[in-house]
A protein has these predicted regions:
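Glycine-rich phosphate-binding/catalytic subdomain of phosphoryl-transfer
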Residues: 1-178
Length: 178
């Protein structure tokens, strides 16, 4: 995404990197000691490893930092491509490794630790909120009416657990694997 929030179709920065890419794991393990790991967990509610977007970005893109305009998960990129809005939800934000669960925003200290400018990260909104209407390009691509609401959405594991158990009390759902 460039500075005008337009898709850069002719100059990708590289191939998409998904959560299964573990090349940054050993590097992140060396960079984060036990005390830091406990502090990251306290602040984010998530264990930290090289598959989270913040360490992955630092590991893979540190030489090309000046070229990067936005950092998005695959879901967030799809939402952007369909609506033009750069937005994520809290469950996906947790996968960035810098989302503070107490104040529900990007944690500036964790962003600084990984060398991330918070301005590169998407806005955070609730998952069941419309991100916007389907844009003309998305309408043509999908054969759907322009303007239909596109929701912010949530992480697949969160949606799967919700679909299995709903919001009912006394219900257990187990998600294993991917």
């Amino acid at each position: 995404i460039d500075e005008r929030r337009a898709l850069v179709r002719d100059a990708p920065l590289g191939r998409a990197i998904d959560w299964t890419d573990s090349r940054a794991d050993a590097w992140a393990a060396r960079r984060v000691d036990g005390k830091q790991r406990a502090e990251f967990y306290r602040r984010t509610g998530m264990p930290i490893d090289g598959r989270y977007l913040a360490p992955m970005f630092e590991y893979h893109w540190r030489q090309r930092r000046s070229d990067v305009r936005r950092i998005l998960s695959a879901k967030d990129f799809l939402c952007f491509a369909l609506t033009g809005r750069v937005v994520t939800d809290p469950s996906t934000a947790a996968g960035y490794g810098v989302y503070g669960i107490t104040d529900r925003r990007w944690d500036p200290e964790l962003c600084a630790y990984w060398g991330l400018d918070p301005a590169l990260l998407p806005e955070i909104a609730v998952a069941d909120m419309p991100a916007g209407g389907l844009n003309p390009a998305g309408s043509r691509l999908l054969g759907l009416p322009e303007g239909i609401p596109i929701m912010v959405g949530a992480a697949d594991s969160v949606c799967g657990a919700l679909a299995m158990a709903g919001l009912a009390e006394d219900t257990v759902s187990i998600v294993m694997g991917s």
